[in-house]
Amino acid sequence: MTLWLGPQPLVLASQSRARQALLTNAGIPFEAIPAKLDERGIARVSGLSAPGDIAALLAQEKAAFVSNHHPGRLVLGADQTLALGAREFNKPADRNEAAKQLRELAGRRHELHSAIAVVRNGITLFAEVVIARMTMRPLSDEEIAVYLDEVGDTATCSVGGYQVEGLGVHLFDGIHGDHSTILGLPLLPLLGFLRSQKLLTL
């Protein structure tokens, strides 16, 4: 007996290795087809300001974009935003911006808003936003420089300049939330939806 009952693999509208690893480890077969969208432009035009709302919109837009090119397929979109108080962070453009973000986050608590949306034929079948709370320890400029030297260009791949599944874990005093939520794809609500659709045997 197999775990997955779908007629075709799930389509993941993301090139994130962390999200792909989460699905692989959960035994969910998938095909990764990234959505080519101007995420910042979509968020700006939307007029939304709440981090969770922006993440939800972008997850839905990614899934809908890929769904339009792959009719009949079940498409999963995901997005994550970082909020420090009322301020939302974007992925740093370069090392200097990553260092600036880390200096702002150091010694403070921020939130990660992770959203997923499941779409078929342009229709959203399921959507969820889950929050994780992260407490970064105080960091000196020297520690930030050492960290950025170690991680290299990957600092620009994630909002906040860190990847907690790697060396980024050294930056934290406290982490409150589901591991998959922190990595940008809340698995538990996704698995619950897939079970409700009779797509899983477990």
UniProtKB/Swiss-Prot annotation:
Q: Which GO terms describe its molecular function?
A: nucleoside triphosphate diphosphatase activity
Q: Its GO CC terms?
A: cytoplasm
UniProt entry tagged with the keyword Cytoplasm: yes
Catalysed reaction per UniProt?
a ribonucleoside 5'-triphosphate + H2O = a ribonucleoside 5'-phosphate + diphosphate + H(+); a 2'-deoxyribonucleoside 5'-triphosphate + H2O = a 2'-deoxyribonucleoside 5'-phosphate + diphosphate + H(+)
Sorted alphabetically, the keyword list is: Cytoplasm, Hydrolase, Nucleotide metabolism
Look up the record and name the cofactor or cofactors this protein needs: a divalent metal cation
The EC number of this protein is 3.6.1.9
Q: Tell me which Gene Ontology terms the entry assigns under biological process.
A: nucleotide metabolic process
On the tree of life, the source organism's domain of life is: Bacteria
InterPro entries, sorted? ITPase-like_fam, Maf-like
Q: Which family does it belong to?
A: Belongs to the Maf family.
Q: What does this protein do?
A: Nucleoside triphosphate pyrophosphatase. May have a dual role in cell division arrest and in preventing the incorporation of modified nucleotides into cellular nucleic acids.
Q: What is the recorded name of this protein?
A: Nucleoside triphosphate pyrophosphatase
Q: What is the lineage of its organism?
A: Bacteria, Pseudomonadati, Pseudomonadota, Alphaproteobacteria, Hyphomicrobiales
